[in-house]
Amino acid sequence: MNFMTSLHDVQRQVVHMAGSCLTFIPMRQRGTGVSSVLWTILICASSVSIAADNHAPTLQGDRFKKLVPFRPTAQFIIGATFNFPHLGTPAEEIFENDFQVLTPGNAFKQTAVHPRPDVWGWKKADAMVEYAKEHGYTMRLHAPISPQCSAWAEEDHRTPKELLQNLEEYVAGLCNRYKGEKHVRWVDVVNETITREGKWFGPKPGVGKWQNPWTQIGFDESHPLRPPIYIKRTFEIASKHGPHLKLLFNQHGGMEKPMWDRAKVTVDYLRDADVQIDGVGWQAHVSAGWERIPGNMQSLDRLIRWTHARDLEFHVTENTVWMDDPRTGTQEAQAATFRAIVTKLAEHSKRGVVVWNVWQLCDSHIQRPQKKGTMFDTSFQPKQSYYAVQDVLRQYSEAVKQ
């Protein structure tokens, strides 16, 4: 074992120990001296990691948060995602220098928090909530009822009653646990409810596939849309148990018209039923050159206008730009796509709240690292995309000052 490997092992063990300790401390007690001790442990872990890893890069120009600082009343908000295992890595350092709004990956999903009856897993979620509080970050919890669910929920013999009980316990438990945390501002309530073809995304036989078992709870037969019962029920529970939270309807895909037509009708269905909904989210996992495909930018423009016309926020929640096509997947093309999306959001900030969240801060931290979808390569060096976004934010900052 060499010296660098030893440092990595120590860092991982110390972060794990701190997270395990946090599991046993009630949230209401985490402003006390006990919390300070644990965060001293995490700081030590970070120091060890920095000795073992490359430092975050020295970047040219103003950092993002200086150009577009977060304010609770801001109309244009920027944020980023990094995960619990990335504490103490250069990704954390990049985030600290550029962002003030954190979405901690998948630590809050059903599969992690309440995968089956009588089983709860709060370690990573609690650690990230406490971390954000200690650093003064605002949070969005990516905690939707969605296809990213546990194997227990996917089992073919699962009954509607069992699924509904697990859903209600999970959503109520999550909102109750963090309802006193004022820095937790948004939560993704549902995600990936509709296919690109405009159908309700449903279950598949077996376990381990990308599927949505929650539609088995049933459908609202009183409405022509026949929306799945779980959608409205999830929003109702989140509103009841998380009264300070802003609730988002998040959707994957591109700008497929059948998908968004159904999503819009679903949002109106919730509003007509006086169910709280505060924003619409689009994941924005796209390939380089996406903005050059005819109709895409026009459809995005119309979607944002439609959202703002209902006094809702519009969020780009998980932006990656894949460099997966050898013909078009260049750094220049990726930078142009990031630039186009962020520019469109900045334009609409005059009419309503827009939020841009970039998904991960290193190519090796995403689910498909071979697609190189982030603004930083596997050595945490910035790509042209970083400077393209920086330029958009600089122009926005200058325009606001005029």
Regions found by a protein language model. Name each.
Residues 97, 101-115, 124-248, 252-254, ...:
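Substrate-binding cleft and catalytic face of glycoside hydrolase catalytic domains
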